[in-house]
């Protein structure tokens, strides 16, 4: 697997209750009042509901929520997330020494606890921890999750953001907003997660925070303004100026653990005032109170500015921007202060779910972050631990106690919480109970990611908003070198359960096990983990693109399945039409007069689902088809569910092949960054692949090209890029869309498929 390919659907999903189209979902849980609830569309509407809920909270609940922050650290790969998190843990006293990524000191960053993570210098799994931060003589509790930057491991970001209340978005001061930054921004919007932004690597040559802020405004389309100005830059970075209260902050001590406050340097005073005015002007555009002050020509106080930043940030209308260097131990502590000042506490976030009614309809309900309400929790992540399956749970309502029983909503089973722990990367600390808003883990519970648990004895059947799971874009065959099928099967089952984007199926025709995922790196990591964790060496086939099949014009069908071989035969006739649609696949019936009984129509729907999994052209999944059955015929003796299911198979194939079918291939958004002297070589390489260049940005030393290329053309691109740039170029891929293949490619794919099918007979 030479190249590192990464892909994910660019589907925007509103947070609370809509389920994504053409994607897998996980049902979760929610619980509260019985009255009908209207879903809010904006944060202002959410806040009305939040304020009502907060009126019912007890002082102890409010106090606990005020001191709690659930935050994630997200960014493009190599922006310094894990290095930043390591400093956070050190400055909060959670670890006693700083260790670097890649395990250069034989230890490695605390949050990258897998050997593979430390060897490769990347985060593969999200890691959870907790720490405390003191500000203004008050102690605040942070639940912190460090997430991967590789698009291949995007599900780790999805499930982290699903349960977090806020985030720190880390942006590289040199590279600025990159492809995965845009993806992470979209994921934050999907789950309505507010963020503060930290511009990292200010000590690097070419660092330009103002360009990065312009890109945040332009590319991420969220108002952003600096609340700091750097003191020095690149190798001369000394500290930052807090422009809100006009104070210079210097990191001192061997590892920057001490903050010294001083007056603003004389040569920066003009810039500080300029950026302060820009901050106030930006806030006036997104906050009514600041707008009133601004229009009246008054000078806002420090408290008024901070209040406006907090309201606008929590309202997801603005992101404050801080800057520094995690590696150089500069500017980290002010970010922790900003987490306290500007990111929401649990009772400032509206968590909504669905309660199943007796008529099978679903009613939206809101959760209360109170320990006195019935328990509701979401299992958002699974890991294989030394004591069995480790299940991470976010407590949305009530409290969870060691030794207590809770109900698994999906199965209705009662399970006992035999052990309750807080996680610190791969270490754990036993606790007796956790309250609303907290994140914990427990052992010995049989469940899947996204399952909901409620307190024992609770009558409501409740599911929370769904977690978005992107479709796989790449597959390969895999088999153990030896006959150790037991360990191999155990590994497959475990990894599927832990990672919803890792798919496994057995191809009965080729007699092969096929694994599918988000990219070559994604699958490569799992092949390596099977070897390391289960002692099973595997042989893998060449990576295969996950094509799709679709139709382009409507097509009518009239198909009769008739089989007679003595005794009762098989008979089923279905009539209708097939149409191309842009949304999810759809099956519909409009039968008048009961010509086809309901049980046979149900069999038809199952037949339709069968056909979607394996299209008539090359055996790949079908996309964007609407099948309507509006007439048909039965036989009093020979008609059966099997007959109508088989008839649907025949009708589907008949209509599909008559509807000018096409083969769709994944088109990837490719971003290549390399030194300027290699620009011609890189552009030529992309053109050779048949790619379409959309944008080129030239920096002082490097350039970045954004293009669209077919995934099929990208195999081996890593090697080609390395050769074209003397090993100095890097690239990332993200799934963009499905697009029809060229006619000659479609013809070749069909011929190869037909040849392979004939060889099996």
Curated annotation (Swiss-Prot):
Keyword Acetylation: no
Protein task: Mitochondrial GTPase that catalyzes the GTP-dependent ribosomal translocation step during translation elongation. During this step, the ribosome changes from the pre-translocational (PRE) to the post-translocational (POST) state as the newly formed A-site-bound peptidyl-tRNA and P-site-bound deacylated tRNA move to the P and E sites, respectively. Catalyzes the coordinated movement of the two tRNA molecules, the mRNA and conformational changes in the ribosome.
Binding-site list for GTP: 75-82, 146-150, 200-203
Gene3D superfamilies registered for this protein in UniProt: 3.30.230.10, 3.30.70.240, Elongation Factor G (Translational Gtpase), domain 3, P-loop containing nucleotide triphosphate hydrolases, Translation factors
Presequence range in chain numbering: 1-33
Keyword Protein transport: no
Family assignment from sequence similarity: Belongs to the TRAFAC class translation factor GTPase superfamily. Classic translation factor GTPase family. EF-G/EF-2 subfamily.
Organism field: Candida albicans (strain SC5314 / ATCC MYA-2876) (Yeast)
InterPro entries hit by this protein: EFG_II (IPR041095), EFG_III (IPR009022), EFG_III/V (IPR035647), EFG_IV (IPR047872), EFG_V-like (IPR000640), EFTu-like_2 (IPR004161), P-loop_NTPase (IPR027417), Ribosomal_Su5_D2-typ_SF (IPR020568)
Protein name per its UniProtKB record: Elongation factor G, mitochondrial
Primary localisation category: mitochondrion
A biological process from GO: mitochondrial translational elongation
UniProt superkingdom: Eukaryota
tr-type G domain: residues covered: 66-347
Any GO MF annotation of the entry: GTPase activity
Keywords on record: Elongation factor, GTP-binding, Mitochondrion, Nucleotide-binding, Protein biosynthesis, Transit peptide
Compartments (UniProt record): Mitochondrion
GO cellular component: mitochondrion
SMART domains from the UniProt entry: EFG_C, EFG_IV
Protein's pathway: Protein biosynthesis; polypeptide chain elongation
């Amino acid at each position: 697997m030479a190249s590192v390919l990464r892909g994910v659907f660019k589907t925007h999903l509103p947070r609370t209750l809509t389920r994504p189209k053409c994607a897998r979902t996980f049902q979760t849980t929610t619980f509260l009042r019985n009255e009908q609830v209207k879903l809010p569309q904006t944060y202002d509407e959410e806040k009305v509901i939040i304020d009502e809920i907060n009126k019912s909270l007890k002082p102890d609940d409010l106090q606990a929520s005020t001191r709690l922050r659930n935050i994630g650290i997200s960014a493009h790969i190599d922006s310094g997330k894990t290095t930043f998190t390591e400093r956070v843990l050190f400055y909060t006293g959670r670890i006693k020494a700083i260790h670097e990524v890649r395990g250069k000191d034989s230890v490695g960053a605390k949050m990258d606890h897998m050997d593979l993570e430390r060897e490769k210098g990347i985060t593969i799994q999200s890691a959870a921890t907790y720490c405390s931060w003191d500000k203004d003589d008050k102690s605040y509790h942070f639940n912190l999750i460090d997430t991967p930057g590789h698009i291949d491991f995007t599900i780790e970001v999805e499930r982290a953001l699903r349960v977090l209340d806020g985030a720190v978005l880390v942006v590289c001061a040199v590279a600025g907003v990159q492809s995965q930054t845009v993806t992470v921004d979209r994921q934050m919007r999907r789950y309505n997660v507010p963020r503060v932004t930290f511009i990292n690597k200010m000590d690097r040559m070419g660092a330009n925070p103002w360009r990065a802020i312009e890109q945040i405004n332009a590319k991420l389309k969220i108002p952003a303004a600096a609340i700091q100005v750097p003191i020095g830059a690149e190798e001369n970075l000394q500290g930052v100026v807090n422009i809100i209260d006009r104070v210079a902050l210097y990191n001192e001590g061997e590892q920057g653990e001490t903050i010294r406050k001083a007056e603003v340097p004389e040569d920066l005073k003009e810039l500080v005032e300029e950026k302060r005015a820009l901050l106030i002007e930006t806030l006036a555009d997104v906050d009514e109170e600041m707008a009133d002050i601004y229009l009246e020509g008054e000078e806002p106080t420090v408290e008024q500015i901070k209040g406006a930043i907090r309201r606008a940030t929590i309202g997801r209308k603005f992101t404050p921007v801080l800057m520094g260097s995690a590696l150089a131990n500069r500017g980290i502590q002010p970010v922790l202060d900003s987490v306290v000042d500007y990111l929401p506490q649990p009772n400032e976030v509206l968590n909504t779910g669905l309660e199943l009614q007796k008529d099978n309809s679903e009613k939206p309900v809101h959760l209360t972050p109170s320990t006195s309400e019935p328990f509701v929790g979401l299992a958002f992540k699974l890991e294989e631990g030394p004591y069995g399956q480790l299940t991470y749970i976010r407590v949305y309502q009530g409290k969870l106690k060691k030794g207590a029983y809770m109900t698994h909503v999906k199965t209705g089973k009662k399970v006992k919480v035999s052990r309750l722990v807080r996680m610190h990367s791969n270490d754990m600390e036993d606790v007796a109970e956790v309250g609303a808003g907290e994140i914990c883990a427990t052992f010995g519970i049989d469940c899947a990611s996204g399952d909901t648990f409620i307190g024992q004895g609770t009558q409501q059947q409740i599911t929370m908003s769904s977690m978005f799971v992107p479709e796989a874009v790449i597959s390969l065959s895999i088999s153990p070198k030896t006959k150790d099928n037991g360990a191999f099967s155990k590994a497959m089952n475990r990894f599927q359960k832990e990672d919803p984007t890792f798919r496994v199926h057995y191809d009965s025709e080729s007699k092969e096990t096929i694994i599918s995922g988000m990219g070559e790196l994604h699958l490569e990591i799992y092949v390596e983990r099977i070897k390391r964790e289960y002692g099973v060496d595997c042989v893998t086939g060449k990576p295969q693109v996950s094509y799709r099949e679709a139709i382009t014009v409507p097509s009518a069908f009239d198909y009769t399945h008739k089989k007679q071989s003595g005794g009762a035969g098989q008979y089923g006739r279905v009539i209708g039409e097939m149409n191309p649609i842009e949304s999810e696949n759809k099956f519909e019936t409009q039968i008048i007069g009961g010509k086809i009984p309901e049980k046979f129509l149900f069999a038809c729907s199952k037949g339709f689902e069968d056909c979607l999994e394996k299209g008539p052209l090359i055996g790949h999944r079908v996309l964007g088809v609407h099948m309507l059955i509006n007439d048909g015929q039965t036989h009093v003796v020979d008609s059966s569910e099997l007959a109508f299911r088989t008839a649907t198979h025949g009708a589907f194939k008949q209509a599909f092949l008559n509807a000018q079918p096409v083969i769709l291939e994944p088109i990837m958004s490719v971003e290549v960054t390399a030194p300027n002297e290699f620009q011609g070589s890189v552009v030529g390489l992309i053109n050779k692949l048949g790619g379409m260049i959309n944008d080129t940005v030239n920096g002082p030393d490097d350039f970045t090209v954004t293009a669209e290329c077919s995934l099929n053309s990208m195999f081996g691109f890593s090697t080609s890029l390395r050769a074209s740039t003397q090993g100095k170029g890097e690239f990332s891929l993200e799934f963009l869309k499905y697009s029809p293949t060229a006619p000659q490619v479609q013809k070749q794919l069909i011929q190869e498929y037909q040849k392979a099918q004939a060889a099996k007979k």
